[in-house]
Structures are given as structure tokens and as C-alpha cells.
Amino acid sequence: MRRIKLIVAYDGTEYSGWQIQPEAPTIEMCLDKAIRELTGENVHVTGASRTDAGVHAYGNVAVFDTESTIPGDRFTFALNRFLPDSIVIQDSWEVSSDFHPRHCNTRKTYEYRILNTAVPLPQKRNFTWHVTGSIDIEKMKEAAAYIVGEHDFKSFCCVRTQAESTVRTIYSLEVLQEGSEIIIRIKGNGFLYNMVRIITGTLIQVGKGRFKPEYVKQMLVSKVRTVAGQTAPPQGLTLVGIEYVDNDDARVV
């Protein structure tokens, strides 16, 4: 039995998230189906990040076990023949049989895009959050600085989170302007349920003048969800990539 790692990109618009759900299309379901059609094996992929409905990815990670003799790097092209256009395998290789995509030391990078125009653009409706009016980028940057570092992010996650600990480390948090788009780029060792979207909603409210930048410090200390900003909608969020710090995902030669 061999373990194959996949780098998966997808447009999450049409899917009810990553994880298999009854009577709803998901990324995991499509990958399982493609592998079954290619190899004849009834296998199930394990994903590194179980993204929500409407969330996208450039570089999510998944693994599956197979008895197929197809070379690891050939699964990229072989599986793409069985996948819809909205899901593409970017790379594939064989890894150690004990590699688990969620049980390793990782750094994940997410991007959230906000379209700041008077009227929305239909071409961007599935990939941005449309926010009208003036937004102070510099105030957003000030607030973002308080979020970097190791903190208890209980105020910045869904109250239904099942995580054993709400402490996470944020390595960087950038607020960038690209024309009419504001980009929030965040890198951390892990993220709680809805954490990036709540951080985004909070920063936007800072930019709109509803919160002062320094109030973010009080949000972190309070550990109460209702003190932070709104949860930004899912479609602006993209998982950019996942770095395995200890090289656990090394290629098997």
C-alpha cells in the first residue's frame, strides 16, 4: 500500500465545503469519485484543511492510500481527467505511509479579498466580498499588528468550535491594496473555525471607523465572540497554501 499526496486547487462556489455531506456536492466527494474511477479502488482522501462552503483554494493538501502502480507524479494528470473543471490537481507525489496532513507542524496561508467599489462587479461576485464606502487601510494595518503573535483567539472563532485549545500563533498579517481590491493575507500555525473570516470582518469595521485599532487588544483579552466584528462571507476567502515545516511530506524516491 502506498500513500499519495495531492495539491488541490478549486473554485468552491458550487460546493458545500470540503467534507462529504449527504446529498450535497463537496470537494472530498469529487476526489473520492475520481480516484475510484481511475484505480477501481474504494478509497477516501484525507484533507489538511476542511474548507467551508464557498471557500476556495490554490493549494489545499490531501492524501489517500492506494495499491495502484501508477507513479506518484502521474496522478496529477491522471486524476484531472476525471475531475470537474472547478477542481484541479496541481501536483502529486508519494509520501511516507505515516504522513498525515493534519497531524504535522504546518504554516497555512489564507487570503481574503474585498471589492471596495460603489457598485459590485458580477465577474468578481464569487471571489470577493463587496463593501461600499470609504475604508481606511492604514487603520486596518494598525489593528492587524495587534493580532500577530501567539494569542487566545476565542473572540475570533465560532462559538460552536470543538477545538481543545483556542490558542494560535499568527506569523504575519498584511493588509494590501490592489486597485479597487483590499487583500488581507494571513499566515499562521493553524486557524479556528471562521477565524480568518471574523478577523476580516473586524478589520473592515476598523477601516469603517466602527472600532478603534487598539480595541483589538481588548477583543483578544475578553475571549468573548460578541465583542469582535462580523463574520465576513465565505466567497472572498482562499486557502493559498500549506507549508510542512519539518518536511514530513518529503517525496518517497
Region roles according to the model:
Residues 1-253:
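Structured-RNA-binding interfaces characteristic of tRNA pseudouridine synthases
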